[in-house]
């Protein structure tokens, strides 16, 4: 107990210092990891509803946000790593912001978004009561190498889960995970028609994807509308308005509904759907920022499938478009995956920026997409973008570190939600 209190004091002191300096959200967590590897397990050990791990290639941050808001609608007090820092140091940093001076966490349940590889290490220390496994897709090539490696990480998360795993029945690699765990399994999914709007690395643009409808699912996404969605739950179709856009975000919503109904089975469906209708996009994941009366959508892209789905959902909109691609560690160094994305849906791109601006411009040229300005410096590029057709709505497709930089730059010009 004394060690836990001392670690908490040191961590909070580092966190306070970093906040005064205006950065380093995960650094306090890194310090705590170095001095006391048992801090996270101790802080999470007494939660009445236990720990939930959300993992997979795409959709972790958005899905976690939905899960948290739905659980809160049922009356539970939820701890989460809401900044999207999904390594264990991010969890530790988030804990430092929530525990009291003695290191006690006041919460009913913890819902944690975790990177697939780091989740494997995490579950060796903290066994989750529930896990939600979304999908397995090719991510940055220099991270995991093979798609089956990523699948093996999710298998280990499931094997460590003590009570219940919630799986995507329509992702073959995720569906097979039920064979690797002793925990009970629940499924979510979507219809074949909707699945074909989401080409995977296995069935890219072939149109031959078929939903695994022979497997009963707790929640099935059946219809996607401009500002609404329909879900099949307990044999009944339920329609709700939504603030989230895109088939993939609404599939994330189906996943979240399935998980929450597993954790709180007595929760009324209408309460969950009402809460879902109010969920706004997670930061940088379709988040809308207003500048001088004009909307700017930040659209995170980090792998072929994610970029393809973003373009399918948003590429045809009549908006000024910017693309910003970096190759820092958090983005992935190997950006050759950009050649696996079809950009022909874009008529033109006003500004291309980031460390890989010229690589991105070359890629666009092969799909005959006209480019206005190429400027590697993100600050200069953003200024150029904002004055170009200033009254027209805008969208920025951006890699992770480009997104966080652009978000910070925009916060210096207009109101941006503080997620620290």
Model-identified regions with their sequence ranges:
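Short, acidic/turn-prone active-site loops that include or flank metal/cofactor-
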Residues: 83-86, 135-139, 190-193, 326-328, ...
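ATP-dependent carboxylate-amine ligase
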Residues: 1-25, 29, 180, 184, ...
């Amino acid at each position: 107990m004394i060690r836990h209190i001392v670690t908490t004091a040191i961590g909070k002191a580092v966190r306070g210092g970093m906040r005064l300096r205006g950065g380093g959200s995960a650094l306090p967590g890194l310090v705590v990891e170095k001095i006391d590897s048992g801090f996270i397990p101790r802080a999470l050990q007494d939660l009445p509803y236990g720990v939930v791990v959300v993992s997979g290639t795409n959709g972790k941050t958005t899905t976690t946000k939905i899960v948290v808001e739905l659980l809160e609608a049922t009356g539970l007090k939820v701890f989460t790593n809401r900044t999207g820092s999904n390594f264990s140091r991010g969890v530790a940093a988030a804990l430092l912001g929530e525990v009291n001076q003695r290191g006690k966490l006041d919460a009913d349940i913890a819902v944690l978004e975790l990177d697939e590889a780091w989740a494997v290490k995490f579950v060796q220390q903290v066994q989750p009561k529930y896990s939600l496994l979304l999908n397995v897709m090719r991510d940055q090539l220099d991270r995991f190498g093979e798609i089956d490696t990523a699948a093996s990480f999710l298998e280990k998360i499931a094997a460590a889960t003590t009570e219940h795993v919630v799986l995507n029945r329509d992702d073959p690699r995720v569906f097979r995970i039920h064979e690797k765990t002793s925990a009970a399994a629940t499924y979510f999914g979507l219809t074949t028609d909707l699945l074909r709007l989401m080409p995977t690395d296995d069935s890219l643009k072939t149109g031959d994807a078929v939903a695994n409808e022979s497997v009963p699912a707790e929640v099935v996404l059946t219809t996607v509308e401009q500002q609404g969605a329909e879900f099949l739950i307990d044999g009944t179709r339920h329609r709700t308005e939504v603030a989230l856009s895109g088939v993939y975000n609404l599939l994330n919503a189906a996943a979240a509904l399935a998980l929450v109904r597993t954790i709180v089975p007595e929760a009324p469906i209408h309460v969950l759907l009402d809460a879902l209708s109010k969920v706004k996009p997670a930061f940088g994941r379709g988040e809308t920022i207003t500048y001088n009366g004009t909307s700017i959508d930040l659209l995170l892209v980090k792998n072929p499938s994610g970029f393809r789905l973003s373009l399918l959902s948003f590429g045809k909109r009549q908006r000024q478009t910017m693309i910003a691609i970096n190759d820092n560690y958090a983005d992935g160094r190997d950006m050759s995956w950009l050649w696996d994305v079809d950009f022909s849906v874009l008529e033109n791109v006003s500004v291309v920026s980031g460390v890989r601006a010229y690589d991105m411009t070359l890629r666009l040229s092969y799909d005959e997409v006209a480019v206005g300005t190429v400027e590697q410096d993100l600050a200069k590029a953003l200024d150029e973008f904002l004055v170009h057709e200033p009254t027209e709505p805008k969208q920025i497709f951006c890699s992770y570190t480009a997104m966080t930089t652009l978000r910070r730059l925009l916060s210096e010009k207009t109101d941006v939600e503080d997620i620290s």
